[in-house]
Structure formats: C-alpha cells, structure tokens
C-alpha cells in the first residue's frame, strides 16, 4: 500500500446523485473512528442555479463533476479502507485500485478558484447572450423566432427582437417564455 505523510487531494468515483451523502458519510466515519488527523476537506464542487419550471423559480444545485467527490487525506492502509468501506463509493480515480494517485496542486487550485468565482449568488441555469436566436414558446408571440438584444439576470427577463410582418419589434419576455434554438 502506498503511503503519503502529507494531505493530498484524491478523486473518488461515486454513484451519481449520491455525492453529497457520500461526502457527509465520510466526514461522519472520520469523526467516529477518530481519524481527523488523516483527513482534511471532503467536497463536492457545485454551484446554486435558478431554474424556472412551470413558471416557478426554483433553486437547484449544479455539480461541476457529477459522480465524483474530492477528498483531502493522508493515504495509508487505514484511511484507504475507511474511504473504500463507504457505501456507493466505486473507488479512487487514477493509479491502481490499491495505489491511488493524487491530483496535482494545480488541478486543485483551478477547482477552488472556480468555486470562488461562482460566489454566493445563484445564477440562472440557462444563460442568454445578445445576438443569440431564441424561440418564443409562451404568450402572444408564441412560435416566433427572435434575436436577444438585452438580458436582465436580476429580473430574469430578456428584450427580444421579433420579426412581425417583416418589421422587427422589440418585446420584453420572461426567461420561461423562451427557449434556445
């Protein structure tokens, strides 16, 4: 078994959809077995996004790496067995099953910087850009195509130019009233 005396970052493959529960389970097992000195952070890199379903705004979580959990640990026989004993953990990524390789500090810093950029404010799940073509799917302009002129993420609204009888008409629409082409 490979031994490391420094806490390094490893990637665990997990059942998709269970990443949060696995991370919590690892934290609980570490406390229960008094192995805090061998483990650092356990994280599931994600951000909050706002979805609009049936006209209702709903916050949901978007995982950057679905099916994976990042864990900071000192790799030895007991820490390896603790992690592998957690239900729904498929194994470590990189190296061999009994000799996992840590990810580089550069890769970890890239992930952490991305998490810092995200911030606390949830972003819309669908991002629109001026000049992009969208299709109106609700309201009086339903089934018309239009070009996005302005985007207001605070109010979840778009200003779209819709061509009606050969003339371009600006229309304000909610995010839920349009879909990307």
From Swiss-Prot:
<dbReference type="GO" id="GO:0140673">
    <property type="term" value="P:transcription elongation-coupled chromatin remodeling"/>
</dbReference>
<dbReference type="GO" id="GO:0005829">
    <property type="term" value="C:cytosol"/>
</dbReference>
<dbReference type="InterPro" id="IPR047050">
    <property type="entry name" value="NGN"/>
</dbReference>
<keyword id="KW-0804">Transcription</keyword>
<dbReference type="GO" id="GO:0032784">
    <property type="term" value="P:regulation of DNA-templated transcription elongation"/>
</dbReference>
<dbReference type="Pfam" id="PF02357">
    <property type="entry name" value="NusG"/>
</dbReference>
<dbReference type="Pfam" id="PF00467">
    <property type="entry name" value="KOW"/>
</dbReference>
<dbReference type="InterPro" id="IPR015869">
    <property type="entry name" value="Transcrpt_antiterm_NusG_bac_CS"/>
</dbReference>
<comment type="similarity">
    <text>Belongs to the NusG family.</text>
</comment>
<dbReference type="InterPro" id="IPR036735">
    <property type="entry name" value="NGN_dom_sf"/>
</dbReference>
<dbReference type="InterPro" id="IPR008991">
    <property type="entry name" value="Translation_prot_SH3-like_sf"/>
</dbReference>
<dbReference type="InterPro" id="IPR001062">
    <property type="entry name" value="Transcrpt_antiterm_NusG"/>
</dbReference>
<keyword id="KW-0889">Transcription antitermination</keyword>
<protein>
    <recommendedName>
        <fullName>Transcription termination/antitermination protein NusG</fullName>
    </recommendedName>
</protein>
<dbReference type="InterPro" id="IPR005824">
    <property type="entry name" value="KOW"/>
</dbReference>
<keyword id="KW-0805">Transcription regulation</keyword>
<dbReference type="GO" id="GO:0031564">
    <property type="term" value="P:transcription antitermination"/>
</dbReference>
<dbReference type="InterPro" id="IPR006645">
    <property type="entry name" value="NGN-like_dom"/>
</dbReference>
<comment type="function">
    <text>Participates in transcription elongation, termination and antitermination. In the absence of Rho, increases the rate of transcription elongation by the RNA polymerase (RNAP), probably by partially suppressing pausing. In the presence of Rho, modulates most Rho-dependent termination events by interacting with the RNAP to render the complex more susceptible to the termination activity of Rho. May be required to overcome a kinetic limitation of Rho to function at certain terminators. Also involved in ribosomal RNA transcriptional antitermination.</text>
</comment>
<dbReference type="InterPro" id="IPR043425">
    <property type="entry name" value="NusG-like"/>
</dbReference>
<dbReference type="InterPro" id="IPR014722">
    <property type="entry name" value="Rib_uL2_dom2"/>
</dbReference>
<comment type="subunit">
    <text>Monomer. Interacts with the transcription termination factor Rho and with RNA polymerase.</text>
</comment>
<feature type="domain" description="KOW">
    <location>
        <begin position="130"/>
        <end position="158"/>
    </location>
</feature>
<keyword id="KW-0806">Transcription termination</keyword>
<dbReference type="GO" id="GO:0006353">
    <property type="term" value="P:DNA-templated transcription termination"/>
</dbReference>
């Amino acid at each position: 078994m490979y031994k490391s005396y420094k806490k390094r970052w490893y990637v665990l493959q997990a059942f998709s959809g269970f990443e949060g529960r696995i991370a919590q389970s690892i934290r609980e097992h570490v406390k229960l077995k008094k192995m805090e000195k061998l483990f650092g952070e356990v994280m599931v890199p994600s951000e909050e996004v706002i979805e609009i379903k049936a006209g209702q705004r709903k916050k949901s979580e978007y995982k950057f790496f679905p099916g994976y959990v990042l864990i900071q640990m000192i790799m030895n026989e007991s820490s390896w067995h603790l992690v592998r004993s957690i239900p729904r953990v498929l194994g470590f990524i990189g190296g061999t099953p009994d000799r996992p390789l840590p990810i580089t500090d550069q890769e970890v810093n890239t992930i952490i910087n991305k998490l810092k950029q995200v911030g606390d404010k949830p972003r819309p799940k669908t991002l629109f850009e001026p000049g992009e073509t969208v299709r109106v799917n609700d309201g009086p302009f339903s089934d018309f195509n239009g070009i996005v002129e302005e985007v207001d993420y605070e109010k979840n609204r778009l200003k779209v130019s819709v061509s009606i009888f050969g003339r371009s008409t600006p229309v304000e629409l909610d995010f839920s009233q349009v879909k990307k082409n």
